[in-house]
């Protein structure tokens, strides 16, 4: 499309929440553009954690990241939205007519409204805070799991105390020869059901310990631990070490887009409206009282933002009916 074409809604971000937002906009018969900075749709869920099992998605007792993304892609294409990957939005200007020009790495696009669904922004994993040979990364030491088979029949240690660390320890349990979970505190920060499952599992819990050193030993890793407020210094010998210390996010693009933020994300009101009228935000990108960083929450925010955007464009148009009345 040329710069002269004006989309009704442009969704920035092709993760699960962005894909669902683009689908729902199609359900409302809107002219939609979906922009994604990565080469593939799916966000962190599809690109970093394809084998991670999700338990908090409505309608799925459990579903892997890659299977959820596959289902969302199937849903998305029903209304044939315009989708552009490998497209980074650099700035968003408001034009004299009140609409927006999005300046991107692949040219300019015009849109009447914008929905930001960029998740946590660009991200890098928090690294292990001890010196180690960088050549170990991707061979013996990992920050992401892209294929569970990499860990099959291996002695595996997982480091971390949040939901991701617990989830990966449980996911690896039936695949690996044995799994140990290392955490610096006595208690874990995960969901109660996950912690209960961990306690019933065969995973060896190593708490409260810090990792003091990681050194190659023959074809394995020797992980020296240090007890927090104690004297014990055991050593674990494993085939692979998975670090789950969270991520450092880069949200510089939010400043370039001139959106008001706090330490948690983009500030929005109850209609998901940002500080710039006509630009909305949903999913893990946003901040409001009571916000939960769940895909399920983002799925609920998407229709709110889309319907408000269309109400802004067409105040006299009948608003959304139940989806069963719309989708055939």
Swiss-Prot record:
UniProt binding sites for FAD: 36, 44, 49, 89, 123, 284, 324
Highest taxon of source: Bacteria
Co-factor note (free text): Binds 1 FAD per subunit.
Required cofactor names: FAD
Catalyzed reactions: 2 reduced [2Fe-2S]-[ferredoxin] + NADP(+) + H(+) = 2 oxidized [2Fe-2S]-[ferredoxin] + NADPH
Pfam families reported for this sequence: Pyr_redox_2
GO molecular-function term, one example from the UniProt record: flavin adenine dinucleotide binding
UniProt KW keywords: FAD, Flavoprotein, NADP, Oxidoreductase
Keyword hit for Flavoprotein: yes
Cited InterPro entries: FAD/NAD-bd_sf (IPR036188), FAD/NAD-binding_dom (IPR023753), Fd--NADP_Rdtase_type_2 (IPR022890), Ferredoxin-NADP_redctase_2 (IPR050097)
EC number: 1.18.1.2
Broad enzyme group: oxidoreductase
Subunit comment: Homodimer.
Family per similarity comment: Belongs to the ferredoxin--NADP reductase type 2 family.
Protein name, per record: Ferredoxin--NADP reductase
Source organism per UniProt: Lacticaseibacillus casei (strain BL23)
């Amino acid at each position: 499309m040329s710069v002269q074409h004006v989309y009704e809604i442009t969704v920035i971000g092709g993760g699960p929440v962005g894909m669902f937002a683009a689908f729902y906009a199609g359900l409302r018969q809107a002219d939609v553009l979906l922009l994604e900075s990565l080469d593939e749709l799916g966000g962190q869920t599809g690109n970093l954690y394809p084998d991670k099992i999700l338990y908090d998605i409505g309608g799925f007792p459990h579903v892997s990241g890659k299977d959820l993304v596959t289902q969302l892609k199937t849903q998305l294409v029903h209304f044939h939205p315009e989708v552009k990957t490998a497209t980074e939005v650099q700035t968003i200007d408001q034009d004299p007519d009140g609409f927006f020009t999005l300046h991107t790495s692949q040219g300019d696009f015009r849109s009447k409204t914008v929905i930001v669904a960029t998740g946590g922004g660009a991200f890098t994993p928090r690294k292990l805070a001890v010196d180690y040979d960088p050549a170990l990364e991707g061979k013996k030491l990992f920050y992401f799991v892209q294929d569970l088979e990499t860990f099959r029949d291996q002695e595996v240690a997982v480091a971390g105390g949040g939901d991701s660390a617990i989830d990966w320890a449980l996911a690896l349990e039936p695949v690996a020869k044995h799994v140990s979970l290392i955490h610096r505190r006595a208690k874990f920060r995960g969901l109660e059901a996950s912690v209960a499952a961990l306690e019933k599992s065969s995973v060896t819990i190593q708490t409260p310990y810090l990792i003091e050193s990681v050194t190659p030993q023959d074809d394995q890793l020797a992980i020296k631990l240090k007890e927090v407020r104690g004297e014990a210094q055991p050593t674990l010998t494993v085939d692979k070490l998975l670090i789950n210390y969270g991520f450092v996010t880069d949200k510089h693009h939010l400043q370039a887009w001139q959106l008001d933020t706090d330490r948690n994300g983009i500030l929005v009101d109850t209609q998901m409206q940002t500080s710039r009228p006509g630009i909305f935000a949903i999913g893990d990108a946003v901040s409001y009282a009571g916000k939960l960083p769940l895909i399920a929450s983002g799925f609920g925010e998407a229709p709110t933002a889309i319907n408000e955007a269309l109400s802004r464009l067409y105040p006299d148009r009948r608003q959304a009916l139940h989806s069963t009345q719309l989708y055939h």
